């Protein structure tokens, strides 16, 4: 993935109008930003361009306004948080194209920053409409994409626009692509993948792609129950997609053919109620009581997974190993995450993780900062794991 241009290749930015596509889709409550993580992550790139004398023009989407203005999806309420995190004033453009945008941009001086209104206020954004992309391009000299989280969508501000102007990856995009290259495209082997979460149905493509690329694949969470069921084990009242038993068997057969070792739970923490601190016991997976649910992996499974991580040089993680939001069913996820973090800190493992639940689980384990890279891009990270091309990245690569 290194065949794309970065800010290092952009030349002098003094006086240049830089269209910077960012992801500002932050959670809001009562008109206030409740989690500024995505804003904080783009601040260094904004500062770098502004400090070099570039005129920073921020493009972003927010919510799903269906191609026309909707006050509840305005980017304006984000302005104060953005300005505060940036430590400098940020102007606002009432539209992202047309006269309102052009006049606001014309007033910028070198080093100024402006946020333009929601790109999704125009139907042309999600349709990847060439005319809308041209209208966006008219306001810039160069284009920088800093929104990996939107890279799996072929929209005008992520794909068509990148083909109309000299296009570069921002620092966040660059870090994400470098991490993903180390994770699967050119990894240090052996590679281990941990895939958890509730359902096999949402991760069939991902599992089929991974068995061909990794040396060891740990399957945990609710989805492991479907595989255990496919092997003829009784999983009691556990979450289980019994209709996908044949799919599970197919994935197991493909893994065998590709010499990928599948690691399934050998024991489980079971309970009869789905609630925190429910009465529980650890049992072998072939002795799950008929009235109980599997809610986490057991101690022997944790030891097996930790042992596999000891052998690996690269780890790719998506999805928790159990119902981590309920104590004590977070034990497996926390123990394995902390073990991977220790190996990473000791320089023995490159660890890449992503997906909403995964980020929350790692933060819960207190190791969100200790992995080599944690991707905040849910859908784009999953599509990359599935081996799909990401339009926003391909558009940058085309110019690389």
Curated annotation (Swiss-Prot):
InterPro entries tied to this protein: Phosphoglycerate_kinase, Phosphoglycerate_kinase_CS, Phosphoglycerate_kinase_N, Phosphoglycerate_kinase_sf
Pfam families hit by this protein: PGK
Family matches, as CDD domains: Phosphoglycerate_kinase (cd00318)
GO molecular function terms listed in the Swiss-Prot or TrEMBL record: ADP binding; ATP binding; phosphoglycerate kinase activity
Record keywords: ATP-binding, Cytoplasm, Glycolysis, Kinase, Nucleotide-binding, Transferase
Transferase recorded as keyword: yes
Top EC class, one word: transferase
GO CC annotations on file: cytosol
Protein EC: 2.7.2.3
Binding annotation for substrate: 23-25, 38, 61-64, 120, 153
Gene: pgk
Pathway involvement of the protein, from the record: Carbohydrate degradation; glycolysis; pyruvate from D-glyceraldehyde 3-phosphate: step 2/5
Swiss-Prot/TrEMBL catalytic activity: (2R)-3-phosphoglycerate + ATP = (2R)-3-phospho-glyceroyl phosphate + ADP
One GO-annotated biological process of the protein: glycolytic process
Family, similarity comment: Belongs to the phosphoglycerate kinase family.
Name the UniProt record assigns to this protein: Phosphoglycerate kinase
